[in-house]
Amino acid sequence: MPLDLSNKRIIMIHGLASKPPADVTHELWRKTLTENIRVGHRQLAKNLDANPQVFETAYWADAVPHHIPDDAAYCRKLALQVDKVIAERREIKDRFHVGMGEKVGSFFKDRGLDLVKLLAGALTVKDDVMTSFLRETELYDQDQYIADRIRAPLESALRRAWDEGREPVILAHSMGSFVSYDVLWRFAHRKTADFKKYNGKRVRMFVTLGSPLGEPSVRNLLFATHHQDHSLRQFPTNIERWHNYACLGDVVSHQKNFHDIFFQPMRKLQLFPANKNFRSIDYADLHNPFEVVTHAGNRNREKRNPHKSYGYLAQPRLGSWLADYLLDRLL
């Protein structure tokens, strides 16, 4: 039986701006999420196949000066690596997830992975990841024209969703998470004409993946940093649920717990609807099996990149929460 998804919209916003073209990025994210959901909800995934408009990408990579999208050969290899992540998710099902009561070392050992080597390997990708992250963060901070262009796709996607009567969810990876935070803050608090109309609108779920928002230096870039003494204006007030995911070895989200920084003070201010469970959750020390595309510059280096978005998009808990949203099972 066809499912009515007419009021649903999953808005996806990527991280560091070295990216495939917009259409390739969108399709790889859509595919990974749909296949994640398919593991536990085959009929729902079939409905998503028939309703691709449920997914929208807020693509901002081309807002960065001198951006050159990845070429077709790289994109083909990337798609193969994404397929490997999907295959592992299908094969081991919910055992893909590191349980909250499970010993992290045992989880990785059971999968033939040496935890020490995994963490050491993550450091070999650290310089490349952090160099790109710091360069783009500096642009976001120092050039407001570029920052406005980076925020614009998500702002447009949210306006469109709300104007169409949809209940949007935001999935934000890496730098996309603090771009999203700024956008949500502006929709909650700005009184100019292009924002005031939406002051009362909300997102059903804000999902941060590999997020650097735990870093004080990142939070200092945000609009909210100028309102730390103004209670409600410290935070976006338009988030119904906030779930944060951090993979083991991810050098960007190493500050993995948002409870003290965001969740507890937001609950104290009653910014999450009252008397509901699971409004804010930290999922930490997660398994990200993504292996980078091999090229001449990295043949002898560790191939795992625990920060990569595709390993986050395959997380079982994310799949089950999105299924609950799409099936109207969120309380």
Segments from the language model and where they lie:
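Solvent-exposed, charged interface segments at domain starts and junctions
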Residues: 90-95, 161-162, 167-176, 256-262
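Glycine-rich loops and low-complexity Gly/Arg-rich segments
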Residues: 34-39, 80-85, 194-196, 230-234, ...
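Active-site catalytic motif of lipid deacylating hydrolases and related acyltransferases
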Residues: 17-18, 32, 48-164
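Lipolytic serine-hydrolase domain surface
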Residues: 64, 205, 211-331
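Aromatic side chains
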Residues: 59-60, 140, 181, 310-312
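Serine-dependent carboxylesterase/thioesterase catalytic core
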Residues: 4, 8-36, 134-242
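Conserved, well-structured beta-alpha core segment at the onset of a catalytic domain
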Residues: 1-72, 325-331
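Generic detector of well-ordered alpha-helical segments enriched in charged/polar residues
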Residues: 30, 34, 131, 155, ...
